[in-house]
UniProtKB/Swiss-Prot annotation:
Primary gene name: uraA
GO molecular function: symporter activity; xanthine transmembrane transporter activity
A Gene Ontology cellular-component term: plasma membrane
Name of the protein: Probable uracil permease
Described function: Transport of uracil in the cell.
């Protein structure tokens, strides 16, 4: 892989590294805290586990890859279902085991090469599953934007959520430079200010919260049903991880798929995810926003991500930060979520397009159709006390159909890359 850009001096003094690291955390901050706020997890804990997860990832990769790990959007709906069905502790127990998916894929890549992932999880499998992740969350976004199950008046809810959505859209489309990377942050700020003028903010939790507070740690509990439900969901973000590593490789001009190797980056992501769940935080994933910031600032030094992780851990011990985040009205988050969740579905569509999946071919048509119908229609399968439904069922069905249905004779067999 060649680098089109002139080389960048990696050596910087610690003060500059710390400042740029804080800048990287700021870029990731909006999306990082959005996941716990939506799912009911603790925002300070999410900051803590993002920092720890990034440090563990760096440990596994020899601190060679300038990438930041934080809360994964792919797990929002499963966490919401798990918390409602089994509680936070059991949901965390199931999420601990999702790291095993990364471990298994890491081993597969180590033995068979990176091309093995493409054969087991081709775009026709991953694409529709990602679409279902986004579409399954759409009703949640709309309900929050309309102020359902809350004390907000309909007119206030629609006004604030639409203003938030339009702000986020505007920044994402028209902003330049670093501003373009933080549309979620701008949307939250505008929505929050509007809520202030409407008298919808209660600052009492912030006043009561201490400056220093240990993040809320949840000890995981393990239940087979929760584990089996959550395991398959890790497939989509694990495969997307490959795209994240390819993106940062392109930005820096270094082939991280070869050194430190995809098997090590997958292992690092898996350990980060399991560690986060052990502490009560959401699973981690690579952040494209931070990769974009690396490209803009041309700071390719992996030590910057060490500083970003340290900042995240330090801020997680400030009780007033978590209390302030808890005051963000759900109608503000609803406006942002309508764009975010829709964009997840678009990523799934993009996966199919980039993979040049012929949807008119009978085999591909059957796989995509069944997965989409199962996901949107709410299909579930019971095995005694164990139930498969939603994204987990869709992932299992997509994999099985891909393995069972014969490939067209004129379909070229991809070689290991």
């Amino acid at each position: 892989m060649t680098n089109q850009n002139p080389p960048v001096l990696l050596e910087q003094n610690h003060a500059k590294q710390a400042f740029v690291g804080l800048q990287m955390l700021f870029v990731a901050f909006g999306a990082l805290v959005l996941v716990p706020l939506i799912t009911g997890l603790n925002a300070n804990t999410a900051l803590l586990t993002a920092g720890i997860g990034t440090l563990l990832f760096q440990l596994c990769t020899g601190r060679q890859v300038p990438i930041f790990l934080a809360s994964s959007f792919a797990f929002i709906a499963p966490i919401q279902y798990g918390v409602t069905t089994w509680g936070i502790a059991t949901t965390m127990g199931g999420l601990v085991f999702t790291g095993l998916v990364y471990f298994a894929l890491s081993t597969l890549v180590k033995i068979k090469g990176a091309g093995a992932l493409q054969k087991v999880f081709p775009p026709v499998v991953v694409g529709p599953v990602i679409i279902i992740i986004g579409m399954g969350l759409a009703p949640v976004a709309v309900d929050m934007a309309l102020g359902k199950n809350s004390t907000y008046q309909y007119n206030d809810a629609v006004f604030v959520s639409m203003a938030t959505l339009l702000t986020t859209l505007g920044v994402a489309v028209f902003a330049k430079g670093m501003m373009k990377l933080i549309p979620i942050m701008f949307g939250i700020v505008v929505g929050y200010i509007l809520c202030l003028f409407l008298g919808l903010i209660n600052f009492q939790p912030v006043i009561d919260a201490p400056w220093f507070s240990v993040p809320e740690i949840t000890t995981p509990e393990f239940k087979l049903e929760a584990i089996l439900y959550l395991l398959p969901i890790a497939i989509a973000p694990a495969v997307e991880h490959v795209g994240g590593i390819m993106a940062i490789s392109s930005v820096t001009g270094k082939d991280f798929l070869q050194k430190p190797g995809l098997h090590r980056t997958l292992l690092g992501d898996g350990i980060a995810t399991s560690a986060a769940s052990f502490l009560g935080g959401p699973p981690n994933t690579t952040y494209a926003e931070v990769t974009g910031a690396v490209m803009l600032t041309r700071n390719f030094n992996p030590k910057i991500m060490t500083w970003a992780a340290v900042w995240a851990i330090a801020i997680s011990f400030c009780g007033k930060v978590g209390a302030f985040l808890s005051t963000i009205p759900t109608i503000v988050m609803g406006g942002i979520m309508m764009l975010v969740f829709g964009s997840i579905a678009v990523v799934g569509m993009s996966t199919l397009i980039r993979g040049k999946v012929d949807v008119t071919e009978a085999r591909n048509l059957c796989i995509i159709s069944v997965v989409m119908t199962f996901g949107i229609g709410g299909m579930f399968v019971n095995f005694g006390e164990v139930s498969l439904k939603g994204i987990s069922l869709c992932a299992v069905v997509a994999i099985l159909l891909n393995l069972i249905l014969p490939k067209a004779k004129n379909t070229p067999i991809e070689e290991n890359r």
